[in-house]
Amino acid sequence: MNLVPALVLLLALAQTVLGATIGHDKVQPFAQPDPVTVSEKAAVKYKPQLQISDSCVSFPAVNAAGEITGGLKGTKGTDGCTEAPLGSQVYGRSTWYQDKWAMMFAWYFPKNFWGGGAKSRHLWANMVLWIDNPALETPKILGASLSRQTLEVPKAVFLSMGEQQKDPYSKVTAIPPMGFVGMQAIQTSRISRFRYTYNYTGGSDISTRVSQGYPDNSAWISLTFAGTDGEYQDLIMWNQLTDQARAALESADFGEDTKVPFNDKNFEAALAQAWPF
């Protein structure tokens, strides 16, 4: 047996399984397929918008061949990540969890941010939207869970610069009015010097909007509900990915501090952490 071709083949297979790393701006996103199943139709119907103001835009993390993004070094602010030249991507996965239907929508960012500045390579963020039944004509939104980072807050000369988050999700059982796409707040009256009452008008009751933002000035960037509209990205569900892409997302190493939340290894645990009821 000729060992050279055999070794070449083994190396090629290993590369396919583990996923080769390519430039963050060279990853071709998946086009959003026409939804066929009940779960796919519900995910498309409830797909959220992502609004970006203080960080990188979202980028695709893997292509059809299983090649994984290399991300960007956590320096120089948003240099190199203000636009995804080949298009962005939102990843999805759905399942029954206890007695609720859970839809996870996840975004990948090539840099992570703290206190307004880039700090490290790679970030995954996700939202879990909980509904009663995807087979209904108009399922009821029961709650939402938005991921946030639990990393240690940097210190300045032995002084903490903020509070470290303990729970990896912020959770609500009612979406705030301004969390819906198109919603506008109309000021109606003044209660006190800094307090007003509002009416809310013009918004969706299905599509939500989230943003990458800071809970305070000394915090790691996390998902929050947005006050203004963002953009939709092409949605690709876990079972719509190619075998190579799924295998790559199972084995890819994005670092100890951020994990692919919707792969087989992490999905169930993420839903347990996101449970808001």
UniProtKB/Swiss-Prot annotation:
<protein>
    <recommendedName>
        <fullName>NLP effector protein Pc109174</fullName>
    </recommendedName>
</protein>
<keyword id="KW-0964">Secreted</keyword>
<feature type="short sequence motif" description="Hepta-peptide GHRHDWE motif">
    <location>
        <begin position="119"/>
        <end position="125"/>
    </location>
</feature>
<comment type="function">
    <text>Secreted effector that contributes strongly to virulence during infection by P.capsici. Induces cell death in the Solanaceae, including hot pepper.</text>
</comment>
<keyword id="KW-0843">Virulence</keyword>
<dbReference type="Pfam" id="PF05630">
    <property type="entry name" value="NPP1"/>
</dbReference>
<keyword id="KW-0732">Signal</keyword>
<comment type="similarity">
    <text>Belongs to the Necrosis inducing protein (NPP1) family.</text>
</comment>
<feature type="signal peptide">
    <location>
        <begin position="1"/>
        <end position="19"/>
    </location>
</feature>
<dbReference type="InterPro" id="IPR008701">
    <property type="entry name" value="NPP1"/>
</dbReference>
<feature type="glycosylation site" description="N-linked (GlcNAc...) asparagine">
    <location>
        <position position="199"/>
    </location>
</feature>
<dbReference type="GO" id="GO:0005576">
    <property type="term" value="C:extracellular region"/>
</dbReference>
<keyword id="KW-0325">Glycoprotein</keyword>
